[in-house]
Amino acid sequence: MATELKKGPLPTDIEETVITIMREEGVRYITAKILRMRLESKYQMEFGPHKAAIDDIVARAMQRPEFKKQLELALKEKDASKSSGGKGSKRARSAGAEAPSKTKKEMTEKPKKPADYPKPAVSSYLLFVADQREELKAKNPGMQNTAILQTLGKMWSDASDDVKEHYRKKAEEDKARFRREVDEYKRQGGKEYGRGGKIKKDSNAPKRAMTSFMFFSSDFRSKHSDLSIVEMSKAAGAAWKELGPEERKVYEEMAEKDKERYKREMAALPK
């Protein structure tokens, strides 16, 4: 019997959780429905009333370089698939094709975590995947990685409350282990790092201002929740180009107000 979901305010770590889920599922495959199911599974609460807020978080997250690259690659592969009649694997490269080389900026921009930095905590979903992946591959030797991940995602969605609770407890234990190790690392003079090797920012810092296009994308997403993020971004981009000056002005004013809000909150921070 499924547990009845409670109602309540957004969790304080919701933005971090949304970004984690987007990383785990991938921009190519995640949809509003998958995101909502994952959030409801983690927090055991309804997220329907918070749809607009979640859309805003996704819009901001899509401005991150890691997700922009995923989106750009997915759109290129989708266009290439269409131009070639959709034949062959979307992920396949031609035999002579080489991966694009990184620029000096890309190679030097991000500071690397020290080798002795504590191993990051793993989410309940990834712990489940780690336990089930090899068994699934053994039973389906010819299954592609994409299909394996999609199957594992469905297995997780269909898993019983007891199974999910088991992995949630394991994830909480791992999170506590990571927190202890990071605290000890900091006591010894080290700095705390976030994902991607960047030094962790202040969690109390104001949220960055949204652009006019981000506000439009959030509005567009709320009306087309059946689309994947890749399809959504492409459709929103096309729709944005079709907007007239008066229609854009609405979103530009929203962006200007948010920019002023960000400036005020930054100015109010203790020096």
Curated annotation (Swiss-Prot):
Pfam families: DEK_C, HMG_box
The protein's name: High mobility group protein homolog TDP-1
Region (Disordered) residue spans: 75-118
Localization annotation: Nucleus
Function of the protein: Unknown. May play a role in transcription and/or DNA replication. It is not known whether this protein is DNA sequence binding-specific or not.
GO MF annotations in UniProt: DNA binding
Main location as per UniProt: nucleus
A Gene Ontology cellular-component term: nucleus
Extent of Basic and acidic residues compositional bias: 101-116
Residue span(s) of domain DEK-C: 8-63
Keywords: DNA-binding, Nucleus, Repeat
DNA-binding region: 118-186, 206-270
